[in-house]
Every structure is written in C-alpha cells, then in structure tokens.
Amino acid sequence: MSQLFLILCFILTHFFAIATSLNDQGLALLSFKQSIQNQSDSVFTNWNSSDSNPCSWQGVTCNYDMRVVSIRLPNKRLSGSLDPSIGSLLSLRHINLRDNDFQGKLPVELFGLKGLQSLVLSGNSFSGFVPEEIGSLKSLMTLDLSENSFNGSISLSLIPCKKLKTLVLSKNSFSGDLPTGLGSNLVHLRTLNLSFNRLTGTIPEDVGSLENLKGTLDLSHNFFSGMIPTSLGNLPELLYVDLSYNNLSGPIPKFNVLLNAGPNAFQGNPFLCGLPIKISCSTRNTQVVPSQLYTRRANHHSRLCIILTATGGTVAGIIFLASLFIYYLRKASARANKDQNNRTCHINEKLKKTTKPEFLCFKTGNSESETLDENKNQQVFMPMDPEIEFDLDQLLKASAFLLGKSRIGLVYKVVLENGLMLAVRRLEDKGWLRLKEFLADVEAMAKIKHPNVLNLKACCWSPEEKLLIYDYIPNGDLGSAIQGRPGSVSCKQLTWTVRLKILRGIAKGLTYIHEFSPKRYVHGHINTSNILLGPNLEPKVSGFGLGRIVDTSSDIRSDQISPMETSSPILSRESYYQAPEAASKMTKPSQKWDVYSFGLVILEMVTGKSPVSSEMDLVMWVESASERNKPAWYVLDPVLARDRDLEDSMVQVIKIGLACVQKNPDKRPHMRSVLESFEKLVTSI
C-alpha cells in the first residue's frame, strides 16, 4: 500500500512539474495557438509545453528578461480568431500576422499592450469596428490593417497615437468623413494609404500638414468630393499623391507635388480640370509652360534634356514627354546652326550611333576648363556596354515607375517600347561635378564587371542632373526578402541552401571589388537593401561608385558608396551596418569596413532579424547566445526549421559572421578568406 502511495505521489509531482514548467508568457501563447483552427505542424513544431519559456519557439522573440517582445507569423495559412490572451503579453512590441486568414473582431485586450510599436494584420479576414481603445497605443509607429473587412469610420481615437509613421488602412470598408485633426496631430506619418474604402466628404485641409510623408499619399478609390485643398501644396515635392477614382471637382491646384504626379493620379474624377490632366477649366487659363513644370530656373540655357525629373509616378507608369524633348532638341539644333562658326563638336566614336551631335557640342574656349565651365546647357548620353540595345530617344519615350528614393536621388523602373526593362538612377548634385570628372568616375565604375556586381549599362550627364542606367533586377532586395515584405521574394524560397549560395555570391562580388578591381576599391556601405536578387535569386551588389559621383553630406567620404535605399529613415539604414571605426571622420576607409558590414548581412541571413528593426543589438545578441552555449535554434530564423538537418552548416556560418564583426578590424578576415570558407560549405552540402 505504501509503495502504491509513493508511486501515486511521484506521478502527481511529475505531472505538476510539467504543467507548471512553462512560464506565463508561454501559457498565453499556447492559448493563442489553441484559438487557431488549422494548426500547421511546420509552424508550431517547437511550441512545446515542457519548455521553461517560449523564447526559442518559431515566430517568437524575447528580450534579455525572457519576456516576449514580438510575434511574427506572416503568411502561414493560419485561420481562426485572435485570442484575448495575447493581451497578457505586456512586453509585446511587435505583432505581424499578415497574409493569413484570421477572422472576427479585434479583442479589446489587444489594445492594453501599452508598449506595442507595430501591429501588422494585413491580408486577413478581420471585420467589425476598430475599437476606440486603439488610442491607448501611444507607442505605436506602424499600423497596417489593409486587405481586411473592417468597417465603420476612421475615428479621432487615433490622435493619441502621435508616434505613428505608417498608417495603412486600404482595401477595407471604412466609411464616413475623414475627420479633421488626423493630419495636424499625426505629423510624423511617412506613409498614409486609405485607398479602396468608402470614405466620403471633402479631403481635410490638415492633410497638407503631413510634411514628413514619403513615397505615396494614397486616397484613391473612395468617394471624396469637393475641391482639392490648396494645403496639399505644402507636401514634399517628391511625394506621389494619388487621388484617382473619387468625386473631386474643380481646378487642380498648381503645385509641383500635384503637377509631378501625372494624369493617372487624377483619373476617374470627371469634374476635375487643369494640368496635368490637360482638361481646360472654363473659368481660368490653366496652361503651364514647360519651364514651370520642369525647372525653377528662369534661364532657359540651364534646362535639362532629361525629362525624368518630372516623373513622380509610383503606381501607374508615366510616359516621358518626348515632344518636349524634341522642342529642346530643335532649339539646341538652331543654336548650333547659329553659332557653328565658333563651336567645335567633340564626338566620341562609340557614341555616334546612339547620340545626337548636339549633345556633345561645346563652345571653343582657351582651355578645357573654360569650355566645361561656360557651357552649362550641354548634355551627354554615353553607353558603357558595347552591346547596348537602346538610345536616348528610346529612353525618353519609355514608361517609368518610381521604385524608391534616398537622399541621393530617385530610382525608376523604365520599360522601353521593345519590352526591355531598365533601372534608372537619377542623381542630383547641384552642378558641382563637371562632365570630365563625371565621365572619369563612371568609366571607372563600368570597369567593374562581375556576375555578382550590378553593372553600369549607360549614363547621361547634364550640369545639374546625372542618370545612371542599369539592368532591371526583378526580385527586389535581399533585406525585403528576409523580412517578408510585400512585393518581395517569399521568404519560403530562401531555404538554407539558397541563402548559402546568396552569401557565397555576395562574397564573390566583394572579393572582386577588393582584390581584382583596378584600384582595389572599398564599397563602404554594404547592407541587405543594396543586395539585389536576380531571376534565379543570384545576388547583385549594387550602389558601387555612387559616392564618387554625388556630392552628398559630409559624412560620406569621396571613395565611399551610398546604397540603393528604398526609404529615408531619420537614422540612415547604412549606419546600422557600419563598422565601429567608420564613425570617426579621421579614419581612412578600409576594406575591413566591408567585411564588418558583410558580417552583419550574414547574421541577418541566419537569424532573420534586421539590425535596423531589432529590439536589441544583433551582434551582441548572437554573441551572448554563443557565450551562454544556447542551442543553434535559439538564434536561427524560424523559417529554417525545415532545414534542421543542415544545422552544422548554419553553425559554421554563424561563426564566420561573428569573425567578420570583430570590433578590432585587424582581427577580421579578408574577403578572400571568407569566400573560401563559403566555397567549402556550399560544396559540402
């Protein structure tokens, strides 16, 4: 009898230990899991109730106190309701459940998470009103509820969320007036998308107070009526304002931010008139001369031949105004005929087939310097690839789509009439760089030809603007793919084998720049946003050479390169990837800077965490896990769960990454050694 009692006590004690081994954070997550109807084994394979905490579970991130700070389960085909237990995770900072099939109303408990910074629920089937309690999320910076079935009005309860930078409510059933007060209070907004709803009334004047907007202000596909408020003229000129498919009426205000948007931004409003839709208003003369549209300078000699400056479209293609180009071309030709006795044309032989003679004519002067300085109305189109398949005329007639922008200019996707797709980077340097210097720099860039470096195809020069033309790379950048951003390669495609080959390709490109380029260059700003992915996910290192051309801020050295960014955060993205010693302006640029940055790219590839958005220092976090002998899966990207049999390879890559991010640059390996390590790893799997 006593033996039976002891056995019973042992069983009860063991059961109690199992039942209580998981902390309150894990229990809340298990309640969340239970509310999901189709629990995929691949998603919740390591959500184990016997764990002491949930910090190693797929999609879960914890801080140093083992409190859950983020839940990221995008595109996992999950369905069910959002369990109120999620509101008990009081340290939660980020929730990303986009592209699933969650349904029902948002639980009020969700809005008790006072520290929540990002809430991304796009692409689900949520419905009902957004609770008034959303105003309690005063730390919220990103709110994306797009592509759901929410209804009701957009409430002033959002006003307390003054830190909001991204507000995306598109493709729902929100109705009623857009309240006055949002624009004047949410002044930090960088993205505002309210398209495809049922919003009515006039556009509030205080929308013009959103002077920090970047990219697109999208109010399209609603039922807004009345006139376009003149306050929109306060918005940044590079912003694309989409007001299409509403019931707006009257003349379009003559502000550059609206004129630059192009006609597609106003289509579907039958009672609008004026430029850029070219429907005259009966009450006023709305004709705008080209100088008002394309330049602020009164002197016609300084106008640019490149009409790319006028293209601001991000969603719909904007046709380049070839007729205006011809107008300027004829004027240039007339001036050439008038002054032919005192002009000399210097035409590069390899340009004769693709360049109009007028673009390479300079007045005869006493010196080369005088020639270049005094003739600021000249333009040059220069192919850098002998097999180039387009000329300047074709480029000017092409459709252009704005892909992104940074502090050094804009990047467009250009589609030629024959279907050829190009990427055109438009640089602005305020005229400081003369033709001779520009051509010398781009010729140096063009000599860097490697399968893993984005190669320059052609360039165009004018005194105040420069164009660099590249092949268009279709699969976006590596950072977007890792983070699973919309429009990028699905993170599911980034298996461990694919990631390893991408890292090897980047190492090949950097090794070529370091070891085999004419001057053994330093790239200077390697990060995942300027690693582009080709059709077969082969990496292309982009942005090389830009710092030599653009007169950027003083923190960019003459031989450093600014990356192709798609956004312009307050703290520039590349600063998160910089080597510690690069912060000193007294330090000479070194190839070991690139090694450090590449080390961070490696860690981002392995962990799935970005140095920019992570709650903690990525290097310190991985180093700490290594020092505490944490299992590999503690730091690995949850998406890599299916490749668990390759864990040894992943551990080796983590070691390479940690070697590259040594604080002492002398202890970092050379890129050649890093490449050799990756070659061995790829061969071994």
Curated annotation (Swiss-Prot):
Topology Cytoplasmic: residue spans: 327-685
InterPro entries in the cross-refs: Kinase-like_dom_sf, Leu-rich_rpt, LRR_dom_sf, LRR_N_plant-typ, PRK1-6/SRF4-like, Prot_kinase_dom, Ser-Thr/Tyr_kinase_cat_dom
Membrane topology: Single-pass type I membrane protein
Glycosylation sites: N38, N48, N151, N193, N247
LRR repeat boundaries on the chain: 65-89, 90-113, 115-136, 137-161, 162-185, 186-210, 212-234, 235-260
Domain Protein kinase: 397-682
GO cellular component: plasma membrane
Signal peptide: 1-21
Alphabetic keyword roster: Cell membrane, Glycoprotein, Leucine-rich repeat, Membrane, Phosphoprotein, Receptor, Repeat, Signal, Transmembrane, Transmembrane helix
Transmembrane regions: 306-326
Residue numbers of Phosphoserine PTMs: S399, S480, S590
Free-text comment about domains: The protein kinase domain is predicted to be catalytically inactive.
Family membership: Belongs to the protein kinase superfamily. Ser/Thr protein kinase family.
Protein's UniProt name: Probable inactive leucine-rich repeat receptor-like protein kinase At1g66830
Species of provenance: Arabidopsis thaliana
